[in-house]
């Protein structure tokens, strides 16, 4: 898990010291609730834990936006809801734009703006703000 989250920091345009990487990864593990899993292999994690690792990895280099393609697609309803709550809280806290693709209307309803598509064209736009 640790190395999985560290990878984007090693290849980022900005150079991070070992101390900076340690601080960033420790904070991300805490924010996604995986402090106790830092030495685990992804194969030993549940689907929800793997998604949380992916979120932490995406946040490692402080992006302006996160793009998610079906972030809850392989998860049960309860875990999917938890993942969406985590995503929304993290992007709100860090001021990051979240763009996601989903076929789940319940997940779409958690977003501020929804674009419905059919045949590659936007057929409807809804905005809650």
What are these regions (language model features)?
Residues 55:
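Hydrophobic anchor residue at the start of the ABC signature
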């Amino acid at each position: 898990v640790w190395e999985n989250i560290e990878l984007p920091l090693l290849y980022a345009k900005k150079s991070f010291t070992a101390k900076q990487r340690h601080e960033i990864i420790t904070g991300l593990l805490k924010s996604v609730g995986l402090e106790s899993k830092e030495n685990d292999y992804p194969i030993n994690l549940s689907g929800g834990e793997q998604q949380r690792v992916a979120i932490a990895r995406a946040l490692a280099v402080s992006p302006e936006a996160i793009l998610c393609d079906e972030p809850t697609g392989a998860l049960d309803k309860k875990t999917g809801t938890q993942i969406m709550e985590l995503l929304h809280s993290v992007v709100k806290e860090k001021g990051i734009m979240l763009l996601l693709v989903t076929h789940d209307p319940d997940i779409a309803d958690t977003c501020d703006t929804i674009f419905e598509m059919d045949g590659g064209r936007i057929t409807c736009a809804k905005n809650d703000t």
